[in-house]
């Protein structure tokens, strides 16, 4: 079967891989779609360590074509996800308290185990979340990581209906954060980016205000918008350092800043302001299986609509180049 495999020179090669036989608790999935995430770019570039030889992909959707004898949670024909959180231990303090993504023994698709950019994938059956029948599978691929990640981040922000939430970076993650916050949580949205096309897209999605933080002072604009109060919360999906610092600058006292994007850099934090204004800066890592079920359902109800563009597996290196150049709006999705 064909698979997108990381090479030593930080490229991706389309190779023929042979799968082993299923072990107890596993299922075999015929891949239909796999979204391309910025985390895939980090993995390819060895930003998190060298994983030469691994098959990329953690936004996979496909149909079960075989199950191990002991599997009861899935059956042949089920449409399921192949997500970043491929498997956790199920026993540690994190797994037993609803925080399974923080498990220290977690396995991640397309990073520590082979992922979904392949014609077939072996999955741990209990971690393959079923996709609602009325949800388009290509759109579901984007929800499998980008969607659940931003849905969880918006939940972590604690934003309430009618409050102001700032979304920094209106790319594959940010456009979904905007939709979950606006259409599910009932928040008012300020979209921040340095690309006018992406900001226009944010406006189409229902953003209440858009700010090009390259052309204007985002703090001054927010203060005008909120009667000098600041935003109630921010979610940062950007992959550059500057927006993370700006996300702290634009919030009010008692606000929460949720970090989601993964720039290879460090934030500059004004510690006195954090302390004196009681500002919380927290990280949010993808989402649990339950978060993914909820994220799928909201998408199936048309409250969230991922913008996807179908591509071929052979275009994967071109997609990564476009990603590095910042020219992608929405999500590139490989069709198998």
From Swiss-Prot:
Cross-referenced Pfam families: ADH_N, ADH_zinc_N
Signal sequence interval, chain numbering: none
Cysteine disulfide links: none
Binding site for Zn(2+) 2: 89, 92, 95, 103
GO terms (BP aspect): acetaldehyde catabolic process
EC number(s) per entry: 1.1.1.1
Co-factor: note: Binds 2 Zn(2+) ions per subunit.
Gene Ontology molecular function, alphabetical: alcohol dehydrogenase (NAD+) activity; zinc ion binding
Cofactor section: Zn(2+)
Catalytic function, reaction form: a primary alcohol + NAD(+) = an aldehyde + NADH + H(+); a secondary alcohol + NAD(+) = a ketone + NADH + H(+)
Enzymatic class: oxidoreductase
UniProt xrefs under SUPFAM superfamilies: GroES-like, NAD(P)-binding Rossmann-fold domains
SMART domains: PKS_ER
Annotated InterPro entries: ADH-like_C (IPR013149), ADH-like_N (IPR013154), ADH_Zn_CS (IPR002328), D-isomer_DH_CS1 (IPR029752), GroES-like_sf (IPR011032), NAD(P)-bd_dom_sf (IPR036291), PKS_ER (IPR020843)
Alphabetic keyword roster: Metal-binding, NAD, Oxidoreductase, Zinc
Binding site for Zn(2+) 1: 37, 58, 145
PANTHER family reported in the protein's UniProt record: ALCOHOL DEHYDROGENASE 1-RELATED, VACUOLAR PROTEIN SORTING-ASSOCIATED PROTEIN 11
Homology family: Belongs to the zinc-containing alcohol dehydrogenase family.
Protein name: Alcohol dehydrogenase
Upper classification of the organism: Bacteria, Bacillati, Bacillota, Bacilli, Bacillales
């Amino acid at each position: 079967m064909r698979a997108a495999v990381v090479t030593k020179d930080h490229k991706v090669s389309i190779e023929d891989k042979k799968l082993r036989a299923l072990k107890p608790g596993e299922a075999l999935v015929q891949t239909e779609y796999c979204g391309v995430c910025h985390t895939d770019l980090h993995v390819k570039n060895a930003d998190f360590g060298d994983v030469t030889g691994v098959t990329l992909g953690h936004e996979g959707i496909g149909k079960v074509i075989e199950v191990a004898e002991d599997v009861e949670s899935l059956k042949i024909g089920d449409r399921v996800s192949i997500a970043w959180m491929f498997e956790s231990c199920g026993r540690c303090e994190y797994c037993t308290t609803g925080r399974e993504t923080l498990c220290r023994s977690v396995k991640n698709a397309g990073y520590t185990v082979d992922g979904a950019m392949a014609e077939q994938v072996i999955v741990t059956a209990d971690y393959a979340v079923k996709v609602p029948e009325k949800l388009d599978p290509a759109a579901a691929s984007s929800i499998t990581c980008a969607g659940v990640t931003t849905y969880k981040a918006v939940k972590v922000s604690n934003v309430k209906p009618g409050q102001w939430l700032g979304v920094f970076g209106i790319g594959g993650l940010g456009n979904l954060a905007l939709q979950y916050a606006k259409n599910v949580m009932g928040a008012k949205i300020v979209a921040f980016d340095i690309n006018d096309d992406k900001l226009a897209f944010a406006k189409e999605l229902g953003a209440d205000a858009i700010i090009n933080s390259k052309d204007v002072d985002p703090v001054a604009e927010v203060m005008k918008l909120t009667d000098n109060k600041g935003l109630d919360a921010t979610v940062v999906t950007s992959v550059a350092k500057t927006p993370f610092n700006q996300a702290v600058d634009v919030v009010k006292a008692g606000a929460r800043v949720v970090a989601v994007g993964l720039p290879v850099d460090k934030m500059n934090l004004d510690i006195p302001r954090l302390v004196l204004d009681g500002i919380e800066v927290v990280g949010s890592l993808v989402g649990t299986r339950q978060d993914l079920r909820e994220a799928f359902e909201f998408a199936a109800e048309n409250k969230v609509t991922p913008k996807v563009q179908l591509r071929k597996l052979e275009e994967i290196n071109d997609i990564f180049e476009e990603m590095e150049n910042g020219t992608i709006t929405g999500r590139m999705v490989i069709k198998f």
